[in-house]
């Protein structure tokens, strides 16, 4: 099926032919680009349609309403985030398997925060649509699956306590969510070297409850406890 723009009363739309699936993807890509700059409010189908060279009527064949498109953009953000977490945890191997396991979860947590630093408007769109949308929630759950897989590997390596469930680790999630919120809502500057160090040390401190004695040893040797507690005000 090929769809094309048509002339409208508001003005002529430059015709551009799309295969059925391609038009849907083009709409999502343009909506995502707008959300990354200005957030959810920038996702307006009647403005997107002429920008990509089709009529609003053609665009609405793919999305019954604006909210469906917003949810696609939010879900796509979680797909991107899962990809970033996966990339962040592919690091250089270290001789200590306990430290390697610790670093893997540390880097994954930092990747989640860094996404909000890099993409604050997109991250806001994701969070604001997480509750009401089953589609968005399903994609968001992929983050939990990825992090739990990391935890399971860490349990096998002896870094994390047996039976740790990532969803139940409130101190670590409080750190991840709190730091992400500061970034996405512009509460504090997050791009400075000092902010980066404090972010990493906050994650280190809030991982404490997950760790075995060996995990604590590896953490404190690689990321000295004196530095962690000093920044935390301990």
Which residue stretches match the model-derived regions?
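Hydrophobic alpha-helical connector segments
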Residues: 72, 86-121, 132, 169-172
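Short, structured helix-loop boundary elements
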Residues: 24, 45, 67, 71, ...
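N-terminal intrinsically disordered/low-complexity leader segments
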Residues: 1-22, 89-93, 185, 214-234
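Hydrophobic/aromatic-rich alpha-helical bundle segments in the mid-to-C-terminal region
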Residues: 124, 128, 133-137, 141, ...
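Generic hydrophobic, amphipathic alpha-helix propensity
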Residues: 23-32, 73-77, 81, 85, ...
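Helix-loop "lid/cap" segments that line or gate small-molecule binding pockets
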Residues: 110-114, 155, 205-209
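Solvent-exposed, amphipathic alpha-helical segments
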Residues: 30-38, 80-91, 175-182
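Helix-turn-helix
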Residues: 26, 30, 34-68, 72
């Amino acid at each position: 099926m090929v769809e094309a723009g048509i002339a409208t009363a508001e003005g002529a739309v430059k015709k551009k032919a799309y295969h059925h699936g391609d038009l849907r993807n083009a709409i999502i890509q343009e909506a995502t680009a707008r959300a990354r700059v200005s957030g959810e409010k920038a996702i307006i189908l009647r403005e997107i349609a002429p920008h990509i060279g089709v009529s609003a009527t053609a665009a609405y064949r793919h999305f019954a309403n604006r909210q469906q498109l917003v949810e696609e953009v939010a879900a796509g953000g979680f797909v991107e985030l899962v990809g970033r977490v996966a990339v962040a945890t592919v690091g250089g191997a270290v001789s200590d398997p306990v430290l390697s396991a610790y670093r893997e979860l540390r880097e994954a947590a930092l990747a989640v925060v860094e996404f909000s630093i890099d993409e604050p408007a997109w991250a806001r769109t994701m969070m604001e649509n997480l509750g009401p949308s089953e589609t968005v929630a399903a994609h968001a759950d992929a983050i939990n699956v990825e992090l739990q897989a990391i935890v399971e590997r860490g349990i096998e390596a002896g870094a994390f306590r047996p039976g740790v469930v990532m969803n139940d680790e409130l101190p670590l999630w409080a750190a991840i969510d709190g730091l992400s919120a500061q970034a996405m809502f512009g509460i504090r500057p997050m791009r400075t070297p000092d902010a980066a160090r404090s972010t990493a040390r906050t994650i280190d401190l809030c991982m404490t409850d997950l760790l075995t004695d060996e995990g604590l040893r590896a953490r404190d040797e690689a990321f000295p406890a004196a530095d962690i507690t000093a920044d935390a005000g301990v």
